[in-house]
Amino acid sequence: VADQINQVYDQVMYDDLYREYWGHSDFVNFGWWEKGTREQKEACEALMEKLLAFIPEKQGTILDAACGKGATTRHLLKYWAPEAVTGINISEKQLETARANAPGCRFILMNAAELQFEDASFDNIISVEAAFHFDTREKFLREACRVLKPGGTLVLSDSLFTRWWERIKPPGRLLNFVEDPDAYRALCQSAGFKDAEIIDAREECAVRFLRACIRFLRGRCLAGAIDRETLTKMSARMSLYVMNIRHYPLVAARKA
């Protein structure tokens, strides 16, 4: 499964059209869209701020689980010194970019569901729009709780898909199925977290992202950068993807 994920994302995340849409920022997530948000990069930065607001005292160390190309890690440097920040990912190609985006941070090739850290290693953990890929969320949550220090906080955003969508994805994805925010909260508690605050941000993140993405594609078509067939195919693909996201939880879980 990891090889399949890398094959897709190592191509998509370096595609010229995708990079243009994300403002060459190296973010690749839905972002948080408020009234007045104009660009995807701005929305991605707003999502980071929304998640980090769950951590009022930004102290100690923080782990960026599934850090992608390091844009999320770079944003953490607004609040943490580089030596306090660790990023992990399963793609060495993306980690090479991450090291350039967030110099001084520690980056390690590592599976988020099999953390190779000692117990109580971090004060905080963040994971942005990645846990639906993990094998599985439950394993990741248990591992996250293990490596957090007492009183530590896990913050994340995630996509909860329909059962139909999970069935057509790679084998094993149904083992990672979570029905709704209530089920997510129960999963956090069973992993060892004492409580979990959850906001369902499907409208603010996934739905508004889709509108912005299609608007961008139409603009590129009018400019002659892509043809109408490409516009139709990409718009249909993105619409199907978002239509099958039932919930987009923002989660803050705290270890006792």
Walk through the language-model features, giving the residues of each.
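Short, glycine-/aromatic-enriched active-site segment of Class I SAM-dependent methyltransferases
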Residues: L156-N176
